[in-house]
């Protein structure tokens, strides 16, 4: 029987078993660390069906646990851990800040941020790590600008966010507690002295009007800050790797920048860094030739769904001309990633400027030597050394 989670050993290829899962059955039986059974969901049509099914819950007390250290967050609840209607109420309070129109107003600021980072990067002696010197500073500056979080605190919250995302690490809960305490203090400061950032606006328009509690705002500020910089940084780094492994595509994007939006969606589909979403059934669900029983755990394999040949054709290849907008890299349904429009814009601006300004960019290490992150639900690599 399959044991979950499964380690990934390649920076660009999925585990070979994923293709086998899609071919074998509607659902694949698996077990977690303590032997508890769960189901792996690997096919595109089934992933989408379950992510919109009201009989599937995100309640962390009912989901499969991935280690002895993996608890229910000790009462911590962001909107990502709540079912409707509570999830719906909270999401509506933040959704307008992440609309396509609102995010587009951030383009000049993001372009300014990326240009400044590239100026500093190009002043360094190569080889240079793309994650440390481009992707992470970019995503962190952007989310700090949006939320109104002091950028000078970045080392503190970057380290805690990374640790808090690791469900099998004993340091995860202490890191989460420190993040909550940090955002609690920041929200209290903004309550006394409101500003125009997203958190300050939420204080003025939501908290002080009684539409959201202090703790609800703090918990969702933790979510927005942590998810807002870590995921984008990893996705940008992997995207740079992929374009360097496909120099003809990088050249095509330099010559035809109008192709970048579709290239971004293909990169999202190709990598699908947020994999293995955990869910549980609250009632019996018939899916294909299987019946999921009430109480059964579910592991939703987004990356497998995004490589389903029945939906995407030659699923293992990277092709920026592929219609890829319907991928599920951001999830699907009511809990689909709130910041997807911002993530797309960050990728579009960062990748476009990087490959236009540094056309001679190349890898400074063997691809097979790249160190893949383990033990985290957010896939990535530890560093990406480049030269020019």
UniProtKB/Swiss-Prot annotation:
Keywords: Antibiotic biosynthesis, Heme, Iron, Metal-binding, Monooxygenase, NADP, Oxidoreductase. It comes from the Bacteria. The keyword Ubl conjugation does not apply. GO terms for biological process: antibiotic biosynthetic process. Pathway: Antibiotic biosynthesis; mycinamicin biosynthesis. One of its GO terms (molecular function) is iron ion binding. Heme binds at residues 87, 91, 279, 335, 337. Its cofactor is heme. Its EC number is 1.14.-.-. Involved in the biosynthesis of mycinamicin, a 16-membered macrolide antibiotic. Catalyzes hydroxylation at the C21 methyl group of mycinamicin VIII, the earliest macrolide form in the postpolyketide synthase tailoring pathway, leading to mycinamicin VII. Uses ferredoxin MycCII in electron transfer for catalysis. Belongs to the cytochrome P450 family. This is Mycinamicin VIII C21 methyl hydroxylase.
């Amino acid at each position: 029987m399959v044991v979950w989670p499964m380690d990934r050993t390649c920076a660009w290829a999925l585990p070979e078993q994923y293709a086998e899962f899609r071919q074998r059955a509607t659902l694949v039986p698996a077990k977690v660390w303590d032997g508890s059974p769960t189901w792996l969901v690997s096919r595109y049509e089934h992933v989408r069906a379950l992510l919109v099914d009201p009989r599937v819950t995100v309640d962390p007390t009912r989901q499969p646990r991935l280690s002895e250290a993996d608890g229910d967050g000790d009462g911590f609840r962001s909107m990502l851990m709540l079912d409707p209607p509570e999830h719906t109420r909270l999401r509506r309070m933040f959704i307008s800040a992440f609309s396509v129109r609102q995010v587009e107003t951030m383009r000049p600021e993001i372009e300014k941020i990326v240009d400044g980072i590239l100026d500093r990067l190009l002043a360094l002696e190569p080889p240079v790590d793309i994650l440390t010197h481009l992707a992470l500073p970019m995503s962190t500056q952007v989310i700090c600008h949006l939320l109104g979080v002091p950028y000078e605190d970045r080392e503190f919250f970057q380290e805690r966010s990374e640790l808090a995302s690791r469900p099998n690490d004993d340091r995860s809960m202490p890191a989460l507690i420190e993040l909550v305490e940090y955002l609690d203090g920041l929200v209290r400061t903004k309550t006394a002295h409101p500003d125009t950032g997203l958190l300050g606006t939420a204080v003025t328009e939501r908290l002080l009007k009684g539409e959201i509690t202090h703790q609800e705002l703090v918990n969702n500020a933790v979510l927005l800050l942590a998810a807002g910089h870590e995921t984008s940084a990893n996705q940008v780094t992997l995207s740079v790797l992929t374009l360097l492994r496909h120099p003809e595509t990088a050249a095509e994007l330099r010559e035809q920048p109008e192709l970048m939006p579709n290239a971004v969606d293909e990169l999202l589909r190709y990598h699908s860094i947020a994999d293995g979403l955990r869910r549980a059934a609250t009632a019996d669900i018939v899916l294909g030739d299987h019946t999921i029983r009430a109480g059964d755990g579910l592991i939703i394999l987004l990356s497998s769904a995004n490589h389903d040949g029945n939906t995407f054709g030659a699923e293992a290849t990277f092709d920026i001309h592929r219609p890829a907008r319907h991928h599920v890299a951001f999830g699907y349904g009511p809990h689909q990633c709130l910041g997807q429009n911002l993530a797309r814009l960050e990728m579009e601006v960062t990748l476009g400027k990087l490959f236009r300004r540094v056309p001679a960019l190349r890898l400074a290490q063997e691809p097979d030597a790249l160190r893949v992150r383990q033990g985290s639900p957010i896939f990535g690599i530890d560093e990406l050394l480049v030269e020019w």
